[in-house]
Design a protein with these regions (language model features):
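Predominant activation on well-ordered alpha-helical scaffold segments within soluble catalytic domains
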Residues: 1-6, 41, 45, 113, ...
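Active-site-adjacent substrate-binding region
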Residues: 73-160
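A glycine- and small/hydrophobic-rich beta-loop-beta segment
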Residues: 32-95, 99
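Beta-strand segments within the central parallel beta-sheet cores of soluble alpha/beta enzyme folds
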Residues: 14-24, 59-68, 130-133
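Alpha-helical metal-binding/catalytic segments enriched in His/Glu/Asp
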Residues: 1-28
């Protein structure tokens, strides 16, 4: 995440940047093409093997990795401002949103939030926070699914809409 926030070329670092897109997110992600399927874990495992990593080194690679789960974020609706926490209400056009939920509906934790927001700050990108209102039911993202399956530290972010 930090390396990706700095201008560079592929030869400047040894990180492997992966972009994964999944199907069936709106119906639970439980398909072979969804985030709950095997594809991302399989690709990362095969990549590690191709680089000569053994099983222990693969676990270490996952532990050193980071994941950005990017989706939409709910911005404040002018007719229903009470549906948002008064101190965490994303506004359209004011930067990406870091999504946080005490019930683990988002994968963000203190470490991944600090990494993400630090990268945004270094890039000169304003960032907002959405903290789920415990009085209002909250959906989820694929972030907790992939984080649970792979053990890769993940931050959930979104564009306010």
């Amino acid at each position: 995440m930090i390396g990706a926030a700095s201008p560079s070329t592929a030869s400047d670092h040894k990180d492997i940047l992966v972009m994964a897109a999944f199907d069936h997110e709106e119906v639970g992600s439980a398909s072979r093409y969804g985030a709950a399927g095997p594809i991302l874990g399989d690709v990362l495992t095969r990549t590690a093997r191709a680089l000569g990593a053994n099983e222990e080194q693969r676990f270490q690679m996952f532990a050193r990795s980071s994941c950005v789960s990017a989706d939409a974020a709910h911005s404040v609706h002018p007719n229903f401002p009470d549906k948002h926490d008064p101190t965490h209400h994303p506004i359209i056009g004011r930067g990406p949103v870091t999504k946080i939920n005490g019930n683990q509906r988002y994968a963000s934790d203190a470490t991944t939030v600090a990494l993400w927001e630090g990268a945004c700050q270094r890039a000169g990108v304003p960032v907002q926070r959405f903290v789920g209102n415990n009085d209002v039911p909250c959906g989820s993202t694929i972030g907790p699914i992939s984080a649970t399956r792979l053990g890769i530290p993940t931050v959930d972010v979104g564009v306010p809409m």
